[in-house]
Amino acid sequence: MESKQKVRKELRTERPSIYSFEIEELKSWLSENGEKPFRAAQIFEWLYEKRVTSFEKMTNLSKELRTKLNEHFVLTTLKTAVKQTSQDGTMKFLFELHDGYTIETVLMRHEYGNSVCVTTQVGCRIGCTFCASTLGGLKRNLEAGEIVAQVVKVQQALDETDERVSSIVIMGIGEPFDNFQEMLAFLKIVNHDKGLNIGARHITVSTSGIIPKIYEFADEKLQINFAISLHAPNTEIRSRLMPINRAYKLPDLMKAVDYYIKKTGRRVTFEYGLFGGVNDQVEHAEELAELLKGIKCHVNLIPVNYVPERDYVRTPKEQIFAFEKTLKSHGVNVTIRREQGHDIDAACGQLRAKERQEETR
């Protein structure tokens, strides 16, 4: 099995983003280049607390070290191509990468703080039939630094109003567990007290259900919140909505969930999108309650976002409430996700898909 370091280095460009480096990696690089390892903490402070935009601004570093940093690294490879702001304060960013690909990042405002939804891949290979992110397939994985830079860019926007990012959800474009090592590096960087210092319990990662990686993630014993994109109460419906279910079947997925809960002691959130006439009836709620019986979990009901390229219709409000009521009657912990950014292209992949359409006209 290839080492984590080798896998990560293979992803890096000729002059990588310094945001890709965990603090211990940066210490090693400094030692190898004749510098004191303690400088890593100073560099992290400039990157994540002061959020400077050039190495020259790192004024407590020697000119020689600043030159070395400039020769070996770039600060960020993201350029803001589009920025949309919703009436409810939701902000959606379309970032252009160094190779011309684009990715999405969303800032969501809540009563409890500001949450950033980050992307982990350019496109997605999973092929969920309700998701705009899969249109065009998977182009490439993001480096950890490209994921970190999304949060930094959003934080820089919030700096203008003296606000801060308080939580992160890894639920943007792509399957995080398909880019596992870079995702782990991202988690360690944003969670580090010298990094963005986002508490582990304020970070959520979601997967469509890549079972081997769920076991691996459980063994990491992180205090990160964990979510599963479930979207169905049985194998037949899940296979229709999510082709990944044909490779990683629902019964095996539930075994992996059980392992995760026992290994970490933490509950799992199940994301359940409601699609009119497909999975939103009371009998589906009854079946879902039976599937989740005895499992330490929370269900997040998601009214589907309309995607023009897909053919699903929205579940009526009264049906959503009936579904919720049925789950509650069986003792299932459940909430309905509050919609945000409804007046902009806020659904995952919509803004990128729109831009791609305009580019090909």
From Swiss-Prot:
Disulfide bonds join C117-C348. It catalyses: adenosine(2503) in 23S rRNA + 2 reduced [2Fe-2S]-[ferredoxin] + 2 S-adenosyl-L-methionine = 2-methyladenosine(2503) in 23S rRNA + 5'-deoxyadenosine + L-methionine + 2 oxidized [2Fe-2S]-[ferredoxin] + S-adenosyl-L-homocysteine; adenosine(37) in tRNA + 2 reduced [2Fe-2S]-[ferredoxin] + 2 S-adenosyl-L-methionine = 2-methyladenosine(37) in tRNA + 5'-deoxyadenosine + L-methionine + 2 oxidized [2Fe-2S]-[ferredoxin] + S-adenosyl-L-homocysteine. One of its GO terms (molecular function) is tRNA (adenine(37)-C2)-methyltransferase activity. Binds 1 [4Fe-4S] cluster. The cluster is coordinated with 3 cysteines and an exchangeable S-adenosyl-L-methionine. Its EC number is 2.1.1.192. The keyword rRNA processing applies. Keywords: 4Fe-4S, Cytoplasm, Disulfide bond, Iron, Iron-sulfur, Metal-binding, Methyltransferase, rRNA processing, S-adenosyl-L-methionine, Transferase, tRNA processing. GO terms for cellular component: cytoplasm. It comes from the Bacteria. Coiled coil: none annotated. GO terms for biological process: rRNA base methylation; tRNA methylation. It is an enzyme of class 2 (transferase). PANTHER family: 23S RRNA METHYLTRANSFERASE, RADICAL SAM CORE DOMAIN-CONTAINING PROTEIN. Reaction proceeds by a ping-pong mechanism involving intermediate methylation of a conserved cysteine residue. Belongs to the radical SAM superfamily. RlmN family. HAMAP family: RNA_methyltr_RlmN. This is Probable dual-specificity RNA methyltransferase RlmN. The lineage of its organism: Bacteria, Bacillati, Bacillota, Bacilli, Bacillales.
